[in-house]
């Protein structure tokens, strides 16, 4: 067999099938597009469903691909076996109703055995088939020439996932020789058995039957081929190494971890597990982030967080106790660059995300592990089970994925009460759900609304005032013919200029009127059958069905909403430009007086980034871009480069809001005709709303001007207060005043020390000998807690062999501090002194053996507490 790099195997595979008339299907992103059934792309065929189910017709019926994939159903095995991975590449050739078994088998055999391609020894190859697949047997035996002893019939060789296409499959195995296992009746030492000798190389699936609802099988009119070859496994064979981890896909990563840790791979079993976990997980994490996923507390983000934290925990067994995973990203990028350039292109961003996540976990890891170790120790002496509440606390407070806790527990032969854990999780979800408020007053669409099929046309893109007719009136959940003044009703217009709340944009408000009545419109939503449903309060008169009316939107509010919505598009584009393409809209609110925009990003924006984004939006406003809005087929919109919002569903015809070249988005909202109409854009806040999501609130036009006017007024007040004439002098004067304050504070603290020292007199006279120890236990008069610590430092420098306990009444609260020379901590501990003394003054405290502090609420007991602690030391 040829000794080939993994990149050469991948390219050979593609080149071979291109020669055989196959089109190359590029590797799709790991985050599925238009497929809600998958968390990740998890196989080579997953991205080709559109061809197999007939939704799309490929340019050619013959397809070849190398598809990156993620599978996380057995994460806990990764690191402990030779070939388990969370990220892998699947090489595959596919036929959509073109060739079938004969060609598929012949192609596979030629690629594996031909000197031009893989040059495998034919005598080392074995195959498995389904017992009833006579055609596959005939092809292997008669056409390929495999003797019967190398064709193994296995009942499990049938691909079936329930209703739909199914069929037998044939698997090709490579015999690695007796070094990897000898014949033993007690072991499954045969192709298809659980062993290390016969490795599966390729799986060919012959999709020729339809699995019917009644569990019968009928032949498919068009038969398909679906094959899969794991690149990592093939690389281990071509490079003649024992496991996938010794291939050129992993070893450069492992070598870098060796440098960081000072440990050597393949010298210690425990170390090897850590090396493999890290090498596997960093590939998954880097590729997932490159394809748009970010660490979070749910969904894909939770998988990433779990993998990263698992890798960090295993890195501790290599004595790596600081963020380092981010340093491996460049290695992954270099290894995979020939076929996957996007990891290198996004390397800086990927590293920032990983480093930020590592730092967050390291902050709580030590404390969390200490708690978990205590829980493990307790469980071993009692129930051999970690309680669900404790597991939930580790998850909720310390960021420990429950699977990580479970894995550690399993290694210690313990279990976790998962039922209670799930109950705690559900309670948290319920609390979150109750905290969310529904912004629509009609939360449940009644049967009455569903029955209304009257046509209603929205004309508000073009006009704000429209003559119309009230076609339906709903009051108290029922259709009515009329309603009176003071009553609240829902109603539908034949034509309406009122925008219904959608896409983050609030509904229009305004009036519906004629000479007999007036309705103040307060809310507009979408009815079940697509009409705009208006809610309003009758100001005067009697409203009747089929009444002719004048519908008028509040012009002032509509103009402000338009400005804010168009500014939101500019903001989205600016964020992508400044922060990176990973930015996606995660929610928005467009109102008359402000806009709010939520977006995916891994950490707080710097002030420089905020300023740059704000300036870019204003520059596009000043550029006076004409806003072109058109409806077109979605395929045309995509060719135009229109940005679709992640997670939104679109029809065949879409509305494109074009502020080219800066912003092109699919949007059903209302916008300005020219960006100059926005006037001014000002960001007023940037904050986090949850893991991986940031929020910007901003103002436009008059609201932005009034905000800046307020800021200017406040600035002028500060300028007046610090008594300077020009704006440029304000900062300089404030810095000068702060420096003065620091110096005065320093002088005051020194004076306080001197006063305290004078009050205390010669402290050596107050030292007592108790139980063979020199002890100074006394009350001090100090202004604050900082001063008591400074007094302690002063006393320690003078009494280096003395146990010192100081107590003070500071504004009605008791402050305690104790120190013990390290040479004496085997006799008495500062932490124990404070733990025993603090309750006497109505408080608590603790600390290290050499230093501890505490507090209390009962200063009247200070004298008693000093007497108590002297007696305590005497009793030791």
UniProtKB/Swiss-Prot annotation:
One cellular-component annotation, GO: cytosol
Catalytic function, reaction form: tRNA(Ala) + L-alanine + ATP = L-alanyl-tRNA(Ala) + AMP + diphosphate
One Gene Ontology term from the biological process aspect of the record: alanyl-tRNA aminoacylation
Binding site for Zn(2+): 565, 569, 667, 671
GO MF annotations in UniProt: alanine-tRNA ligase activity; aminoacyl-tRNA deacylase activity; ATP binding; catalytic activity, acting on a protein; transferase activity; tRNA binding; zinc ion binding
PROSITE patterns attached to this UniProt entry: AA_TRNA_LIGASE_II_ALA
Required cofactor names: Zn(2+)
Co-factor binding comment: Binds 1 zinc ion per subunit.
Record family assignment: Belongs to the class-II aminoacyl-tRNA synthetase family.
Summary of the function given for this chain in its UniProt record: Catalyzes the attachment of alanine to tRNA(Ala) in a two-step reaction: alanine is first activated by ATP to form Ala-AMP and then transferred to the acceptor end of tRNA(Ala). Also edits incorrectly charged Ser-tRNA(Ala) and Gly-tRNA(Ala) via its editing domain.
Name assigned to this protein: Alanine--tRNA ligase
Source organism per UniProt: Staphylococcus saprophyticus subsp. saprophyticus (strain ATCC 15305 / DSM 20229 / NCIMB 8711 / NCTC 7292 / S-41)
């Amino acid at each position: 067999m040829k000794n080939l790099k993994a990149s050469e195997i991948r390219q050979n595979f593609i080149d071979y099938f291109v020669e055989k008339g196959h089109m190359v299907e590029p590797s799709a992103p790991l985050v599925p597009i238009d497929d809600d059934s998958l968390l990740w792309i998890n196989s080579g065929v997953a991205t080709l469903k559109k061809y197999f189910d007939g939704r799309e017709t490929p340019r050619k019926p013959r397809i070849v691909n190398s598809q990156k994939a993620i599978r996380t159903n057995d994460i806990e095995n990764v690191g402990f076996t030779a070939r388990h991975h969370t990220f892998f590449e699947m090489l595959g050739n596919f036929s959509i109703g073109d060739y079938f078994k004969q060609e598929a088998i012949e192609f596979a055999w030629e690629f594996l055995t031909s000197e031009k391609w893989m040059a495998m020894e034919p005598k080392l190859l074995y195959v498995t088939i389904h017992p009833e697949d006579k055609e596959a047997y005939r092809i292997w035996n008669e056409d390929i020439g495999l003797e019967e002893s190398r064709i193994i019939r296995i009942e499990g060789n049938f691909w079936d996932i329930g209703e739909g296409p199914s069929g037998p499959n044939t698997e090709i195995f490579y015999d690695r020789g007796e070094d990897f296992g000898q014949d033993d009746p007690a072991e499954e030492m045969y192709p298809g058995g659980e062993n290390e000798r016969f490795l599966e190389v390729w799986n060919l699936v012959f999709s020729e039957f339809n699995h019917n609802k009644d569990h019968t099988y009928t032949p498919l009119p068009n038969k398909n081929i679906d094959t899969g070859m794991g690149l990592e496994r093939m690389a281990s064979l071509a490079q003649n190494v024992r496991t996938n981890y010794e291939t050129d896909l992993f070893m450069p990563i492992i070598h870098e971890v060796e440098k960081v840790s000072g440990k050597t791979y393949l010298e210690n079993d425990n170390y090897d597990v850590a090396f493999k976990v890290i090498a596997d997980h960093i590939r998954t994490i880097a590729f997932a982030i490159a394809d748009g996923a970010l660490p979070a507390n749910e969904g894909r983000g939770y998988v990433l967080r779990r993998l990263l934290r698992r890798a960090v925990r295993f890195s501790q067994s290599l004595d790596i106790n600081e963020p380092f995973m981010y340093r491996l990203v460049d290695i992954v990028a270099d290894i995979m660059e020939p076929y996957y350039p996007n990891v290198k292109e996004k390397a800086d961003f990927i590293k920032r995300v990983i480093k930020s996540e590592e730092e967050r976990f390291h902050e709580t890891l030590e404390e969390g592990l200490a708690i978990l170790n205590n829980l493990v120790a307790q469980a071993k002496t009692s129930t051999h089970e970690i309680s669900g509440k404790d597991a939930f606390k580790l998850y909720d407070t310390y960021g420990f994925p429950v699977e990580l806790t479970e894995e550690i527990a399993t290694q210690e032969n313990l279990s976790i009460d998962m039922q209670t854990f799930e109950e705690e999780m559900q309670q948290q979800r319920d609390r979150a759900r109750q905290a969310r408020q529904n912004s629509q007053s009609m939360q449940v669409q009644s049967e009455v609304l569903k029955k209304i099929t009257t046509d209603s046309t929205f004309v508000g893109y073009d006009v704000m005032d429209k003559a119309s007719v009230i076609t339906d009136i709903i009051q108290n959940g029922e259709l009515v013919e009329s309603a009176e003044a003071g009553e609240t009703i829902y109603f539908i217009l034949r034509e309406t200029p009122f925008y219904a709340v959608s896409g983050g944009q609030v509904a229009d408000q305004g009036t519906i009127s004629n000479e007999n009545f007036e309705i103040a419109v307060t809310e507009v939503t979408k009815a079940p059958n697509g009409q705009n449903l208006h809610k309003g309060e009758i100001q005067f008169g009697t409203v009747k069905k089929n009444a002719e009316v004048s519908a008028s939107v509040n012009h002032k509010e509509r103009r402000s909403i338009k400005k804010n919505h168009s500014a939101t598009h500019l903001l989205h584009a600016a964020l992508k430009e400044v922060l990176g393409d990973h930015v996606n809209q995660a929610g928005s609110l467009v109102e008359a007086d402000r806009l709010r925009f939520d977006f995916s990003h891994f950490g707080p924006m710097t002030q420089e980034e905020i300023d740059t984004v704000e300036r870019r939006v204003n520059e596009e406003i000043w550029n006076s871009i004409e806003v072109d809005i058109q409806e077109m087929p979605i395929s045309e919109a995509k060719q135009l480069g229109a940005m679709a919002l992640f997670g939104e569903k679109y029809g065949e015809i879409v509305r494109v809001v074009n502020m080219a070249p800066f912003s092109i988005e699919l949007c059903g909202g209302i916008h300005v005709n020219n960006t100059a109409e926005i006037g001014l854009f000002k960001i007023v806040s940037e904050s986090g709303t949850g893991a991986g999501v940031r929020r910007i609130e901003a103002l436009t036009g008059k609201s932005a001007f009034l905000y800046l006017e307020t800021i200017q007024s406040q600035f002028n007040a500060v300028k007046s207060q610090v008594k300077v004439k020009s704006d440029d002098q304000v900062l300089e004067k404030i810095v000068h005043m702060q420096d003065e304050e620091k110096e005065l504070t320093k002088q005051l603290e020194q004076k306080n020390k001197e006063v305290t020292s004078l009050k205390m007199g010669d402290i050596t006279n107050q030292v007592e000998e108790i139980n063979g120890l020199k002890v100074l236990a006394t009350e001090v008069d100090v202004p604050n807690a900082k001063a008591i610590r400074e007094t302690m430092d002063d006393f320690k420098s003078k009494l280096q062999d003395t146990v010192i306990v100081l107590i003070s009444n500071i504004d009605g609260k008791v402050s305690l501090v104790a120190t013990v020379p390290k040479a004496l901590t085997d006799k008495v501990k500062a932490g124990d002194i404070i733990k025993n003394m603090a309750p006497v003054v109505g408080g608590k405290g603790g600390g290290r053996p050499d230093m501890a502090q505490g507090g209390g609420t009962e200063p009247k007991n200070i004298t008693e507490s000093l007497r108590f602690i002297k007696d305590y030391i005497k009793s030791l």
